[in-house]
Amino acid sequence: KNEFSPYAQTKSIAEREVLKAHVPGKMQTIALRPHLVWGKGDPHLLPRVIQRHRAGKLKIIGDGTNQVDLTHIDNVAHAHICAMKAMLKNENLGGNPYFISQGEPVYLWDWLNQLFPRLDLPPLSRSLNFKTAFLIGSGLESLWSLFKIKKEPPMTRFVACQLAHDHWFSIKSAEADLSYKPVIKMNQAMEETLPWLQSL
């Protein structure tokens, strides 16, 4: 939830300002919402997960059945091109946000457990229930704030929510208005990204 993440809060504020600036026929603006971007060169999502697993510090958060959307970087780039072309064709198009993803939600922990053996890592079996993870995140945030530690805590309330809950979205609006279609599917994206992940 946004109230647990300054990053999400500031993105929401920026999006509102961008959409508010839309003036049909004069200045066109839209907002693209790619979800959990990954791929070769990703400095955040998968490298962090892999690093924590190698350090023995990764557990399944929640019951392990949550579905999430991921978006390969090629599809993010393609969505921007689709948006540009759509706005050039229709000067009145704009003022709306569009979710961008693979259009193939995955069971997060199953997906990761299929990946780990290909990186010479064992599948995860240890778990931590969501309420406990959330409370740990809340406590760590308070400690980090009290001692003015700049580095992000190993667990936060926002991360607990992201790792334990469903978060996937319809891309029908992007398909209809922007003619967006994913150019690379999950399986192909993983095969193309795997050599880079193995090199980390």
Annotate each language-model stretch with its function.
Residues N2-R33:
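Active-site Tyr-X1-5-Lys
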Residues S5, V68-D74, V106, F169, ...:
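Residue-level signal for the nucleotide or nucleotide-sugar donor/cofactor binding architecture
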Residues Q9, I13-A14, D42-R48, G62-A86, ...:
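Substrate-positioning beta->alpha
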Residues Q28-A31, K59-I60, E91-L93:
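Conserved active-site beta-strand element of glycosyltransferases/polysaccharide synthases
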Residues H35, K40:
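Proline-glycine-enriched beta-turn/loop adjacent to the NAD(P) cofactor-binding site
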Residues R48-L70, L124-D166:
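Alpha-helical membrane-targeting segments
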Residues A86-P154, I171, N187-L194:
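Mid/C-terminal beta-alpha module of Rossmann-like enzyme folds, strongest
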Residues F169-D177, K181-L200:
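Amphipathic terminal alpha-helices
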